Amino acid sequence: VVGKPYSFLHIDKAEIDLDKGIDLYDEQVYAKASENLKKFEAEGVYINDTSKKYYFYRQIMNGHSQTGIVGCASIDDYLENRIKKHEFTRADKEVDRIKHVDICSAHTGPIFLTYKNSDVLDAIIVSETEKEPVYDFVADDGVRHTVWSTSSTSVDESIESAFSELDALYIADGHHRAASAVKVGLKRRGENTSH
């Protein structure tokens, strides 16, 4: 991250901003991650988007393209097994992510979910990604990243309706991040009963 002051690694792997040899699980690492996130938000590098909408994210690398929907899922979907797991998690990795999410007050690690084919969602993705993107750039590693936001409330409602018709979502990557988010969510609910 030399020469990249706004790299996300300053948040996700904040030990890079501390003395070499620091224990990766030292409380200073989580505090530095939180400090960096707040700094980047204050500087406008990262934006806390409070609107209720979805995004579409496409990556193109070596001629391969993949496009997905970016949104939030409820911890209740996980607890009620509508988000299906296929791996066990390790307690030490969960504790690390729990501390990170809790101290940063942000879930900074995406969880890659898949779902059974949905013609409705496919049609929405095609339609929405024909519009002007919010971001479109090629990173230093040659990967092209393109992001679109939904164009209307009715599109958001159509996506939400289509997801409600699915029996389940499946974790493809992010079992530890998902389990940790759920545990922090339950902790926060316990602390704020009106949540």
Language-model features and meaning:
Residues V1-H195:
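A cross-family signal for N-terminal binding/gating loops and helix N-caps
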